[in-house]
C-alpha cells in the first residue's frame, strides 16, 4: 500500500525557527512502517511536531527512478453491478515521470491494459518527496 504522509516540523534558518510542512510518499506494509520510514529518512535528531497519514493509494503504475517527479492521476472505471446499473469508480494512483510527455505515455499505456472502460480524469503534479 502507498501512503502519503504529512510532516510538520521546525527548521532553524539564521537563528530563527521556521515552521515547515513536507509531504512524503512511500510504500510500506502499514502506516506505522510508513511513519518510521519517514522519521528514519529525515533524521532521528529532528523534532517532528506532527505526523499525519493523509491518504493511502493503490500501487503505483510504474517504478520510481532517481530524479522523477511524483504525479497523482485519477482514473475512472465504469463497472456494471449485479442489477445491470453502471457505476463509475474513481481512484487516485501515483505515477513517476521526468516530465509531462513521459507521464502521458505511461498513463496511455496503463489505460490500454484495462479490462473495463477506464478514463483519465485528472493529473496533479506534486512536490512530494518519494521514499523508496
Residue ranges of each PLM-predicted region?
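A short beta-strand micro-motif
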Residues: 2-10, 71-78
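Glycine-rich, aromatic-bearing surface loops/beta-hairpins
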Residues: 114-132
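A cross-kingdom feature marking solvent-exposed beta-strand/loop segments within repeated
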Residues: 11-26, 86-93, 113-115
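Hydrophobic, ordered structural segments
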Residues: 19-42, 96-100
